[in-house]
Amino acid sequence: MSRIGNRLLQIPNGVEVKIAENNLVTITGSKGTLSKQFSPLIKIEVEENKLITKRLNEQKHTKQLHGTTNSLLQGMLTGVSEGFKKELQITGVGYKAAVNGSKLNLSLGYSHPVEFEIPDGVVIQAVKPTELAITGIDKQLVGQVAANIRAYRKPEPYKGKGIKYKNETIIRKEGKAAGK
């Protein structure tokens, strides 16, 4: 059985946590502010620079929510104090990316350039024409934006062309063996 919900979450210095009556948690830090509504089955308290989550009953669904709530709160605390970053690499002849204002222009071997609208709360930098850095305070949003960009041209297993995460390893396949 997982005991993630029983962890005490340390509130970093410079981070302020407010809990409204309807379990609306607002966390403010040096990087920004995040708010999220949590289930009324989980009680959230602040005691001596620690966040404590308690479940109100022992049903299976409530136990699942307990661990999920704890993990989401930890992500919010990390996001407003340190932020999150995902890095993408673009591999392929002529494949490149450029940031123009609030749009990301991708050349991925299609007959047309791909334009990606950068959502609010996320910053995308083209470190090189073949490397992207996606940063923000919302863990879910940063990961979703990275996944959406990667989905335009997933890495293929024969030559490895496409968009991949920086530390991702692509399992390569051997091409067809030549016949007689």
Swiss-Prot record:
Keywords (A to Z) from UniProt: Ribonucleoprotein, Ribosomal protein, RNA-binding, rRNA-binding
UniProt GO molecular function: rRNA binding; structural constituent of ribosome
Which domain of life does the UniProt lineage start with?
Bacteria
An example of a Gene Ontology cellular component annotation for this protein is: cytosolic large ribosomal subunit
Q: Does the keyword RNA-binding apply?
A: yes
The record's InterPro entries line, in alphabetical order, gives: Ribosomal_uL6-like, Ribosomal_uL6-like_a/b-dom_sf, Ribosomal_uL6_a/b-dom, Ribosomal_uL6_bac-type, Ribosomal_uL6_CS
Q: Name one GO biological process term.
A: cytoplasmic translation
* Keyword check for rRNA-binding: yes
Q: Which Pfam families match?
A: Ribosomal_L6
**What exactly does this protein do?**
This protein binds to the 23S rRNA, and is important in its secondary structure. It is located near the subunit interface in the base of the L7/L12 stalk, and near the tRNA binding site of the peptidyltransferase center.
Q: Which family does it belong to?
A: Belongs to the universal ribosomal protein uL6 family.
Oligomeric state and partners? Part of the 50S ribosomal subunit.
What this protein is called in its record is Large ribosomal subunit protein uL6
The organism named in the record is: Mycoplasma capricolum subsp. capricolum (strain California kid / ATCC 27343 / NCTC 10154)
